[in-house]
């Protein structure tokens, strides 16, 4: 959580009353100041959190909020009436109407996975790719794909920890 690229966003969410920073404080297992030896304009706090504890605390916070209804689904289409988004239709044909919609697309819009020389449509760990990009395109939005990469994982048993230093 935080870092050079996203630390300002965490601070903005905190300033607006969000719980991201509070949850990070409660579930953090390592806190560092990046670029501590450089000038103040390039310093940035970063925290590593216990992933499961962070998820459970955020889930509890959201589920405890009386004015929030939580639906987990793959949004297939945006419902538009008179140039206003009034809801969404899910891939299971469930219609959810709302006065406002926050679209958090993540990385699954037209998701394409590359494994070696093979390419296939999809998201992480077998999840389906999102089709909401087709709905956005039909509404006149320019939708692009951005390539992200996940490096190979290292087997912890192959590391000689005697040659590392504690941070």
Set out the residue ranges of the language-model regions.
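Local beta-strand N-terminus motif with an aromatic residue
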Residues: 68, 85, 98-99
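Conserved N-terminal/central alpha/beta ligand/cofactor-binding core
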Residues: 1-77, 92, 104-122, 127-133, ...
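Catalytic cores of nucleotide-enabled group-transfer and carboxylate-activating enzymes in metabolic
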Residues: 80-83
């Amino acid at each position: 959580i935080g870092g050079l690229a996203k630390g300002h966003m965490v601070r903005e969410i905190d300033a607006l009353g969000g719980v991201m920073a509070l949850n990070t404080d409660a579930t953090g297992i390592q806190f560092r100041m990046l670029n501590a030896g450089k000038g103040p304009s390039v310093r940035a706090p970063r925290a590593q959190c216990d992933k499961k504890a962070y998820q459970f605390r955020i889930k509890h916070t959201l589920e405890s909020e009386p004015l929030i209804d939580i639906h987990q689904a793959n949004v297939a289409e945006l419902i538009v009436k008179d140039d206003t988004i009034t809801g969404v239709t899910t891939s299971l044909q469930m219609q959810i109407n709302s006065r406002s919609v926050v679209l958090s697309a993540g990385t699954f819009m037209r998701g394409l996975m590359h494994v070696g020389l093979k390419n296939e449509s999809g998201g992480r760990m077998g999840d389906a790719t999102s089709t909401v990009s087709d709905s956005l395109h039909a509404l006149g939005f320019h939708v692009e794909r951005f390539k992200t990469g996940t490096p190979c994982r290292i087997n912890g048993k192959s590391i000689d920890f005697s040659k590392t230093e504690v941070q």
